[in-house]
Amino acid sequence: HHTPSWGGNSLQAADFDGDGDVDIQVINGDNVNGNHIGKVVPAPRPQHGIRVFRNDGALKFTEAYYYRLHGAIRSVVHDFDGDGDQDIAAISLFPQWTYDEPETFVYLENKGGMKFEPQSIAKEFFSVWCSIEAADVNGDGRTDIVLGLGNFPELVPPDWITAHKAMQGRGGKAPSVIYLLNQGKG
């Protein structure tokens, strides 16, 4: 059994269940170990994903939610939909490239009771995202999500690069930064 501490990349502290104490959200997805320049990253590991650990109020944390996200690297936590609870947005630097639509970004809308509804972005925006931030970039009072591109061609299988170029319709030139503007609907 693989412990969730393996491949830990980031964590966030927030009250995900609304009980007044701080819970912990952990990102596991480090796939750099064993990677060799010019070779595809090894297959995703079973511990990769997003975990939320509920605080019982006495600083005992129990895993209450898990979402598999191959190669997860970073996350931001905020009440993006304005409903009073904390949502999660996360990126993967090492997604499962063999999928028809590799998941490189996920937004997990908190539905309460430690249940989250996953949403993603259009496939023409799939890319090797290595940074994520939350900020009101257009000044409308709602927190948006900003994704930053990493230039790591050695991490992407050659056949997927060809498919990615065709999907994008821009000759494979993903934007360096994209803004996911909050429309106030989650």
Predicted regions and their residues:
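Beta-propeller-forming repeat regions
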Residues: 1-186
